[in-house]
Amino acid sequence: RDLVRSRGLGDVYKRQPLISRAKEKKELAQVFQALRIAVNGEMDALESFLNQCVEALRPGGRLAVITYHSLEDRMVKNFMRTGRTDGHEEKDLFGRSSSPMKPLGSKPIVPTDDEVERNPRSRSAKLRVATKL
């Protein structure tokens, strides 16, 4: 049967016998998030954006990216650390990293408890900053 509306997908999902009713809302949100990411090509767009930033920034310029889920965050973290979204570090003949970026700090900046209380949507946000070498 064709799924025309999101409610139809939710109904199909709820009929599955292994779905935990306590986790139903979170799991269903993840299904819709995965569909949105795939349909909108969000990961491809992010990868393209990151690669273009290297060309757009001058040496010493800073790149700041806010991510909202782990797939985005992993891609941004890898890019800022290695210069590649897959995390594979390229090295020169002397074994030195040839990454065009250097992360500022090893951990992302996350919202405070007070900010999350005022703005619940911020709870999953992570800010990462890097400098172009």
Predicted regions and their residues:
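S-adenosyl-L-methionine-dependent methyltransferase catalytic core, i.e., the SAM/SAH-binding region
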Residues: 1, 6-133
